[in-house]
Amino acid sequence: MKAMEGKIIQVLGPVVDVEFESYLPAIFEALDINFEVNGVQKSLVLEVAAHLGGNRVRAIAMDMTEGLVRNQVVKARGKMIEVPVGEEVLGRIFNVVGESIDNLEPLKPSLTWPIHRKAPSFEQQSTKTEMFETGIKVIDLLAPYSKGGKVGLFGGAGVGKTVIIMELIHNVAYKHNGYSVFAGVGERTREGNDLYFEMKEGGVLDKVALCYGQMNEPPGARNRIAFTGLTMAEYFRDEKGLDVLMFIDNIFRYAQSGAEMSALLGRIPSAVGYQPTLAGEMGKLQERIASTKNGSITSVQAVYVPADDLTDPAPASVFAHLDATTVLNRKIAEKGIYPAVDPLDSTSRILSPQMIGEKHYEVATGIQQVLQKYKDLQDIIAILGLDELSEEDKKTVERARKIEKFLSQPFFVAEVFTGSPGKYVTLQETLEGFGGILEGKYDHIPENAFYMVGSIQEVLEKAKNMKNS
């Protein structure tokens, strides 16, 4: 047996124990097994997770372990799992070990990076807070993203999480000339498939790299896929000096797969059965998502909240890292207002006059006050009707309804379905429009003119056309 070869001594589901004669692979080192199942040649990658004493290691499999038997030969790589990086990854789909899985020509990478890397040091990190303009009115105005910040995207099924993700990818590609990386962490294969074809249809595929570790895969693949995607994003930030968007769907599944791995490795669980190292593992991933003096990684993370319990250890460990939250609300979607972002529930750390400027802060808080007042008046309106309100309250209700309509916006990636051309609205135009509504400049314009348009100029044109027709 060669020095770097070992043999399998035990297989427990996705956990494999391997014994080496003279060599001891390091923690996180990759091991390769080539074997045959029913006449089909297969290869499997393992990652060393624990040393068991002697020259024995416990490793986590990155794919199904069916067909493995004791005494099979295992080869140590002498290095970690490495994945392709660079512009050649754009428009392709990868699995956790960096193999292309889109049935196209296999990628022969010219450059690979290990998936476990150090977070940027204090000296490398950028301390200035800069707003990241998305071109989506409701986000830029009420819950702005910061460059290199982390955003939580909360929402149930079918309220438009994927459409917002695609629109952000589109706007980053076309307005900021940047790239995006999408990591599908433990979600449905069907959703990954849909996303790929929707992106192809929406024309954004050539600006994004997709990494999938789906629900049906072992916990090792579901956990490490987040690092695979992040490594690709880090290359664009560190080597190309770009501002990259990183999407993780779903960050809860990262914690969940970590819990499964922890139990399989024999660690004693902590609260609610999660791994004792939950906070540390979450920090290891989140700390790598940062702004440096070269570029930035801004991440949007979909967060599944089990049983709607925000105190569950997994979502609670995510909250500590988030700079902004974008909450999608089914009631808003039912009104036909898309994007269905809740203007009162969504938050942002940078929504303060020091960070975004006095004018933006004033307009944003003014809008929130009007919407909150409208929400408070809903019960009275339901019982007594609009006529019983004071003149001032009637004005508030009128403006609030216009604001609600004006927070809707046609998306580029939804053009195929809606038939109305997408709009990118600059922050300047957004502030001008909403500031004008608050000042009462547009009180004479009917509320339907505010629905599904971009800037306030379009509202005026739409109102003019409505009047003429």
Swiss-Prot record:
CDD domains: ATP-synt_F1_beta_C (cd18110), ATP-synt_F1_beta_N (cd18115), F1-ATPase_beta_CD (cd01133)
Reactions this protein catalyses: ATP + H2O + 4 H(+)(in) = ADP + phosphate + 5 H(+)(out)
Pfam families: ATP-synt_ab, ATP-synt_ab_N, ATP-synt_VA_C
Cellular location(s): Cell inner membrane
GO cellular component: plasma membrane; proton-transporting ATP synthase complex
Keyword Cell membrane: yes
PROSITE patterns in the cross-refs: ATPASE_ALPHA_BETA (PS00152)
GO MF assignments: ATP binding; ATP hydrolysis activity; proton-transporting ATP synthase activity, rotational mechanism
Protein's UniProt keywords contain Methyltransferase: no
Gene3D superfamilies: 2.40.10.170, Bovine Mitochondrial F1-atpase, Atp Synthase Beta Chain, Chain D, domain 3, P-loop containing nucleotide triphosphate hydrolases
Keywords, sorted A to Z: ATP synthesis, ATP-binding, Cell inner membrane, Cell membrane, CF(1), Hydrogen ion transport, Ion transport, Membrane, Nucleotide-binding, Translocase, Transport
Top-level class of the enzyme under EC nomenclature: translocase
Alphabetized SUPFAM superfamilies for the sequence: C-terminal domain of alpha and beta subunits of F1 ATP synthase (SSF47917), N-terminal domain of alpha and beta subunits of F1 ATP synthase (SSF50615), P-loop containing nucleoside triphosphate hydrolases (SSF52540)
UniProt-listed Enzyme Commission number(s): 7.1.2.2
UniProt function note: Produces ATP from ADP in the presence of a proton gradient across the membrane. The catalytic sites are hosted primarily by the beta subunits.
Stated family: Belongs to the ATPase alpha/beta chains family.
Name of the featured protein: ATP synthase subunit beta
Biological source species: Helicobacter pylori (strain P12)
Native organism taxonomy: Bacteria, Pseudomonadati, Campylobacterota, Epsilonproteobacteria, Campylobacterales
